[in-house]
Regions:
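Hydrophobic positions on the long internal alpha-helix
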Residues: 24-28, 32, 41, 67-68
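Active-site helix of classical SDR
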Residues: 25, 60-63
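Active-site-adjacent segment of SDR/Rossmann-fold oxidoreductases
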Residues: 49, 70-81
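C-terminal beta-strand-loop-alpha-helix "lid" module of Rossmann-like NAD(P)-dependent dehydrogenases
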Residues: 80-132
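Substrate-binding pocket helix/loop in short-chain dehydrogenase/reductase
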Residues: 1-2, 6-11
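Active-site loop immediately N-terminal to the catalytic Tyr-X3-Lys motif
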Residues: 2-3, 49-56
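Residue(s) in the substrate-gating loop at a strand-loop-helix junction
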Residues: 44
């Protein structure tokens, strides 16, 4: 829980997940720019899904998402492509590493509000280490395949969400829809349900990789379409 966490854990996660990405990008940027290469960062499904119990990790991956999106816009001017890989629950050493850090921290103070939960987590960590369970989850072959696509595909995506189960894909779509509806309700110029559907229909070919959007006439038509929505007067009503 965030209110019980020590800042050292946050610093550890940001050092690995955020500052590490920044340092490597800075170090290799000249070579990548010279060769017109590609940059692929490893984010996570937690870069846009947040929940109780992993807030610090999620915060670090949200930062990777923002860093990657901004870097992509900047490097585009230098003919360098940037993408993010967003794995779901695949086998890795993340959980094992976290367990080892928790058990090694013998000076950790008891939680004020969630001590029972902390003891349960520590017990599970001990059981896992005693049983010799190292990596849990689906083998990460699909993640490696996504990295290869981002590096070598002729028309790569800027984000590759890689999840082993349909339910994880459903979580991401549900979260995105929830955020769209929440954002739409925050201001006095919100759209009606029908208008939102029309906007989604307009964006659909672009999201599907329709290359007709590269056509100047099509782009002009789309600019006119969104300009019409941007300049409409008054608050929409059902």
């Amino acid at each position: 829980p965030l209110i019980e966490a020590d800042i050292s854990e946050l610093e550890f996660l940001f050092n690995v997940n955020v500052y590490g990405v920044f340092r490597v990008t800075k170090a290799f940027a000249p070579l990548v720019i010279e060769s017109k290469g590609r940059i692929v960062n490893i984010s996570s499904i937690s870069g846009f899904l947040s929940g109780g119990g992993y807030g610090m990790y999620s915060a670090s991956k949200h930062a990777v998402e923002a860093f990657t999106d901004s870097l992509a816009r900047e490097m585009e001017e230098l003919d360098v492509f940037v993408a993010a890989i967003e794995p779901g629950n695949f086998a890795s050493e993340i959980g094992l590493s976290r367990c080892k850090r928790r058990l090694a921290d013998t000076d950790a103070k008891p939680y004020v509000y969630f001590e029972e939960r902390r003891q349960q987590l520590l017990a599970r960590c001990r059981e896992r280490l005693e049983a010799g369970v190292e990596n849990e989850g689906t083998p990460p072959d699909a993640v490696a395949a996504a990295i290869e696509l981002a590096l070598f595909e002729e028309n790569p995506k800027d984000h590759y969400l890689v999840v082993p189960r349909q339910v994880e894909a459903g979580w991401t779509i549900a979260k995105a829809m929830e955020e769209i509806l929440s954002l739409n309700a925050r201001h006095e110029h919100s759209y009606t349900r029908d208008e939102l559907i029309e906007l989604m229909d307009a964006y659909w070919p672009l999201a599907a990789g329709d290359k007709s959007f590269d056509d100047e006439a099509t782009n002009a038509e789309m600019r006119a379409f969104f300009q019409r929505w941007a300049t409409r007067e008054g608050k929409a009503t059902e």
